Regions:
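Membrane-interface helix caps and helix-loop-helix hairpins in membrane proteins
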Residues: 100-101, 165, 191-197, 222-228, ...
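Intrinsic disorder in cytosolic terminal tails and internal cytosolic loops
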Residues: 1-9, 194-197, 462-488
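12-transmembrane solute porter fold
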Residues: 11-33, 46, 228-242, 248-426, ...
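Interfacial helix-cap and linker-helix signal at transmembrane-aqueous boundaries
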Residues: 38-39, 70-71, 156-164, 219, ...
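Peri-membrane helix termini and adjoining interfacial loops of integral membrane proteins
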Residues: 180, 421-432
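Flexible interhelical linker loops that connect adjacent transmembrane helices
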Residues: 3-6, 181-209, 251-266, 327-328, ...
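C-terminal membrane-cytosol helix-exit motif in multi-pass small-molecule transporters
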Residues: 122, 174-193, 209-221, 238-253, ...
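Transmembrane-helix bundle of Major Facilitator Superfamily
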Residues: 1-186, 321-322, 329, 333-335, ...
């Protein structure tokens, strides 16, 4: 084999894996601007419409650790294709949905598919590229796709809903997924260390996945029922009980689904805290900003989607610079700068008025937050995998994505609760509906800005600059084939 062959093969495989990842990120937000149309056609009640978003986030966040560990134990390409098949089939089912229950079920299965697929894809990337400049380049592109995918989803959702119909936001995944399934066996290497014992931690998987699903469910339903409602408290108590049981199980079993020793990697722990807070601030910023544009400024689905183009283009434009800065100086400063920008963008957006204008009131905060995603997603992706052993690659990538999805669910739930509560207070005080809605969104944006800024002390306390700088300094490219157990 020539020295060029593995390089070309790796980047072909990376392109396919990146497309699969991009689909999962886009589907987090692509339905946001389509919700009114979906609600009308499928006869959702106003309170139940949130489950079109929540069902996906719930299963996505809940099953990520399970998907990551399954990839390490059962073969990463095999699990990737299983998840991709589920995601594609569920996308088709969602497009063909004729009722509310069918749509929610399809979105839940779509989330499971994404949770199985995503850790496998990222761990394959990690094992194709050795630590150093080339892995940083790959993860820089990966992080850039994550940063731009959320805003691209809103834009694509607006365009498709306006000109084709909401069904096409789901049809879009079907041909892409089908082509990826055909190409994956040909260009994506299978990997699994032969030394890994294939014992599956069933008790830990059930307790951990069940606890995460209940946690996301409790957070998601809290805006509807209230944080003090018996139903919310009961679900939260169940989540806590299962998660405590999960920790006890993981301390005792021989082959845990989440070896707790992985948190001794301080950089990994810091990156996951930053990922949690990034999801809690930026994903919720998109949610609140879209509601403000549609409910207060009366933007159409297309207008609301296109408005986010400013953030998306900024993120894409700065992704290369972010990757270069990380390679030269490590992740800590770049990550902290990115989270500062996201927090600052949300706080700037608190100044939006009732009769707002895009250029005067929205473009600036969106550009600042978009820049923040480029400088946050990329170093977080790199730091979360720095120093991780190959046999734990799926686990580490699943852990990072779990942090981001749980953060998004928590942030949206908190923002919804704060906005709804403050809006009701203003309405009872005699304010007109547009002013009350705007006041509620402003209050929520203050909270989201604070969530973003909370990441800064965690980054400086936990992320070790020397660990990542050492990895960045290694420029040798590893041929992955000897380390991979090829399977037919």
């Amino acid at each position: 084999m020539t020295s060029q062959s593995p390089h070309i093969d790796r980047w072909r495989a990376f392109a396919l894996l990146a497309v699969a990842f991009f689909m999962t990120v886009v589907d987090l937000t692509i339905v946001n601007v389509s919700l009114p149309a979906i609600g009308r056609d499928l006869h959702f009640s106003q309170t139940n419409l949130q489950w079109v978003v929540t069902a996906y986030a719930l299963t996505f966040g809940g099953f990520l650790l399970l998907g990551g560990r399954a990839a390490d134990l059962l073969g990463r390409r095999r699990i990737l294709m299983l998840g991709l098949g589920l995601f594609t089939a569920a996308s088709l089912a969602a497009a063909l949905a004729t009722g509310a229950g069918f749509m929610v079920g399809a979105r839940a299965v779509q989330g499971i598919g994404a949770a199985i697929m995503l850790p496998a894809a990222l761990s394959i990337v990690m094992n194709m590229f050795g630590e150093g400049a080339e892995r940083n380049k790959a993860l820089g592109i990966w992080g850039g796709l994550g940063a731009g995918g959320a805003t691209f989803g809103v834009i694509a959702g607006g365009l498709l809903t306006q000109y084709a119909g909401w069904e096409y936001i789901f049809y879009l995944n079907v041909p892409i997924g089908a082509v990826a399934l055909l190409l994956a066996p040909r260009i994506v290497p299978e990997s699994r260390l032969e030394t890994v014992r294939r014992r599956f931690d069933a008790a830990g998987a059930l307790a951990g996945t069940g606890g995460l699903v209940l946690l996301v469910a409790a957070i998601s339903q809290a805006p509807q029922y209230g944080w003090g409602a018996t139903r919310t408290i009961a679900v939260l108590a169940g989540a806590v009980a299962l998660l405590v049981a999960f920790l006890l199980i993981e301390r005792r079993v021989t082959d845990p689904i989440l070896p707790l020793s992985i948190f001794r990697l301080r950089t990994l722990a810091g990156a996951n805290i930053a990922g949690l807070l990034l999801g809690g601030s930026f994903y919720a910023f998109i949610f609140v900003g879209t509601l403000y544009m549609q409910q207060v400024l009366h933007y159409s689905a297309l207008q609301a989607g296109l408005a986010w183009l400013a953030a998306s283009l900024t993120s894409i434009a700065l992704a290369g610079l972010s990757q270069a800065l990380v390679t030269r100086g490590g992740t800590k400063i770049v990550m902290a700068a990115g989270m500062t920008m996201i927090g600052a963008g949300a706080i700037w957006a608190t100044q939006v008025p009732v009769h707002g204008h895009f250029l005067a009131n929205l473009a600036g905060p969106m550009v600042v937050a978009g820049a923040g995603t480029a400088f946050a997603f990329i170093p977080i992706s790199i730091a979360a995998l720095a120093g991780v052993k190959e046999q734990q690659a799926g686990l580490a990538s699943g852990l990072l994505n779990t942090s981001q999805q749980l953060g998004g669910a928590i942030g949206i739930a908190i923002a919804s609760s704060v906005a709804a509560s403050h809006t009701q207070t203003l309405l009872h005080a005699g304010h007109a509906a547009p002013a009350a809605l705007t006041g509620g969104f402003q209050q929520a944006l203050w909270v989201l800005g604070a969530i973003g800024l909370l990441a800064i002390p965690a980054i400086f306390a936990l992320v070790r600059r020397e660990a990542v700088s050492t990895a960045a300094a290694k420029t040798s490219v590893r041929d992955p084939q000897p380390a991979l157990a090829a399977t037919s």
